[in-house]
Amino acid sequence: MPSKEGSGCRRWCFTLNNPTDGEIEFVRSLGPDEFYYAIVGREKGEQGTPHLQGYFHFKNKKRLSALKKLLPRAHFERAKGSDADNEKYCSKEGDVILTLGIVARDGHRAFDGAVAAVMSGRKMKEVAREFPEVYVRHGRGLHNLSLLVGSSPRDFKTEVDVIYGPPGCGKSRWANEQPGTKYYKMRGEWWDGYDGEDVVVLDDFYGWLPYCEMLRLCDRYPHKVPVKGAFVEFTSKRIIITSNKPPETWYKEDCDPKPLFRRFTRVWWYNVDKLEQVRPDFLAHPINY
């Protein structure tokens, strides 16, 4: 029998007869964030009617009205059986067009959910918040799994903002007020605690990272940074560098500053009490090319 609206449910199955190309593409485009597990197979009924047979196990309860907004023509019912039962039923004809997450074993829902979150590339802080008990028991193992498979290598140009000016003018405050999660890199080799934050802040910088390392950090190619006992992918979208000194003075004369300047996206200067973006033609070398 079709489900009544009720208070919502996490586990739903559905049938969608004669699916259109648009409906099939929509199903294929679904992402992992909302689901513990999902599977959709393409089948033909006894009368030859093509249809989609699907199963959704959401992380949060969903009402029928919300599901109808996703697939208005589908017939939804509250699911019976386990994830494994529904996996078998929806894949019986072998033409599976969507699978998300992993099938949970009985009594291990939280653990399997945490593993699935790590496998999908979620940040460890997010995994710890969503599965705190699992993290307390298996945090080291989840971290090791994340190091092996969790993060995809960088495939984009990390933006680099340089802001310099006299002490006490507000550079650090400006960096802290920028949007996104932040990792403050301390002096030294290690990046312990780095979890792919949106922004890396190099505060009060004057060349205390090796020049070749700075070039790699500020570039667009895959790069790993060291944590105790391992290396992790550097995936931050933005680097903010604050300094009392202009960037052309950070490194010795035998380090050509031009490659580093080329990686800068924007350069800022505190003029008295006003922050101004420096015009590229006023800088010692060209930037952002």
Curated annotation (Swiss-Prot):
Keywords: ATP-binding, Covalent protein-DNA linkage, DNA replication, DNA-binding, Endonuclease, Helicase, Host nucleus, Hydrolase, Metal-binding, Multifunctional enzyme, Nuclease, Nucleotide-binding, Nucleotidyltransferase, Transferase. A motif (RCR-2) lies at residues 51-53. GO terms for molecular function: ATP binding; ATP hydrolysis activity; DNA binding; endonuclease activity; metal ion binding; nucleotidyltransferase activity; RNA binding; RNA helicase activity. Signal peptide: none annotated. A motif (Nuclear localization signal) lies at residues 4-13, 60-80. Pfam families: RNA_helicase (PF00910), Viral_Rep (PF02407). Transmembrane segments: none annotated. It catalyses: ATP + H2O = ADP + phosphate + H(+). It is found in: Host nucleus. Its cofactor is Mg(2+); Mn(2+). ATP binds at residues 165-172. GO terms for cellular component: host cell nucleus. A divalent metal cation binds at residues 43, 51, 93. Essential for the replication of viral ssDNA. The closed circular ssDNA genome is first converted to a superhelical dsDNA. Rep and/or Rep' binds a specific hairpin at the genome origin of replication. Introduces an endonucleolytic nick within the conserved sequence 5'-AGTATTAC-3' in the intergenic region of the genome, thereby initiating the rolling circle replication (RCR). Following cleavage, binds covalently to the 5'-phosphate of DNA as a tyrosyl ester. The cleavage gives rise to a free 3'-OH that serves as a primer for the cellular DNA polymerase. This is Replication-associated protein. It comes from Beak and feather disease virus.
